[in-house]
A protein has these predicted regions:
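Conserved small/polar residues in nucleotide/adenosyl-binding loops
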Residues: 1-5
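Non-heme Fe(II)-dependent double-stranded beta-helix
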Residues: 8-147, 153
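Short edge-strand/loop segments of extracellular domains
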Residues: 137-139, 187-192, 248-249
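Histidine-centered catalytic micro-motifs
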Residues: 144-151, 230-233, 247
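Acidic, His- and aromatic-enriched active-site or binding-groove loops in soluble protein domains
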Residues: 147-166
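Double-stranded beta-helix
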Residues: 162-166, 171-234
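A short hydrophobic beta-strand segment most commonly corresponding to one strand
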Residues: 168-171, 240-249
Length: 249
């Protein structure tokens, strides 16, 4: 099962507009830092009633997971962390959780019949959801996600196959280019657990993985990526705003 594709214009403009409006409101009500109870205007921050934090903030243009044991240590290398072009003291929203409970438009998107039909065609009618996360890469400050494979649980399974860890949809709310979009190394979902450090060293660039390709998109496009595929994204030094609603099956 080779999944590294893009469906163009799946999400129609009225749906994109609704998602943009609700997302902008949430970002305006985000806490000023992880664990803070107030937003940048001094109001009570959104989402304090939920068991899981809605927002995860990072330093501008940083790589918060690379080279750490966070998320089961699946990001073994570190991306470059360029200095912001202007002095930015505040942390920035990087991840948002719980799209189904934070936005009515997010709940509708999760049940989009075309996307659920794609999920059934890949996994069969007995598929189940497992997670969602919205990646926010604001222009000139958005953080990076170092090279990784999403799967962590089934690498040694006696029933291992190329699709055992499932796949992710990413719904794009804005146009993205090479500096802001997701990058994927085609075919790596077939290789099992990859020695990511070694593979990066085999290339000629300290940050760009050999054979990686950009999944540049327009607003309303949906990418479909096997969770075993090697992928990552760079610090967003571009003028693009990238908001990618990510959910998998």
């Amino acid at each position: 099962m080779c999944i590294r594709d893009r469906f163009e214009g799946v999400i129609e403009q009225p749906e994109v507009d609704s998602l943009r409006v609700e997302m902008a409101d949430l970002l305006d009500r985000a806490p000023v830092d992880n664990g803070s109870t107030v937003d940048k205007k001094g109001r009570p921050a959104f989402g304090q009633e939920f068991a899981r934090p809605t927002f995860y903030l990072v330093e501008p243009l940083s790589d918060p997971w690379g080279g750490t044991e966070i998320l089961n240590g699946r990001h073994p290398t570190k991306m470059n962390e360029p200095a912001p072009s202007s002095r930015v003291n505040e942390k920035v929203v990087f991840i948002m959780n719980g799209m189904c409970q934070t936005m009515p438009s997010g709940l509708r998107l999760y049940g989009h019949p075309d996307l659920l039909g794609i999920a059934a065609s890949i996994n069969g009618d007995d598929y189940v959801p497992y997670n969602d996360a919205t990646f926010v890469k604001q222009p000139g400050v958005g953080g990076s996600v170092s090279w990784h494979q999403d799967g962590v649980t089934h690498w040694k399974s006696p029933d291992w196959d190329q699709g055992i860890h499932g796949f992710n949809f990413q719904v794009q709310l804005y146009d993205t280019g090479a500096r802001s979009c997701l990058w994927v190394v085609p075919g790596t979902h077939k290789l099992g657990k990859i020695d990511i450090k070694r593979r990066l060293l085999e290339g000629s660039d300290s940050e760009l993985m050999p054979d990686a390709v950009p999944l540049a998109c327009n607003a309303g496009d949906v990418t479909v990526v096997n969770r075993q595929a090697l992928h990552g994204s760079f610090a967003n030094t571009s003028n693009d705003l990238r908001i990618s609603l990510t959910f998998g099956f």
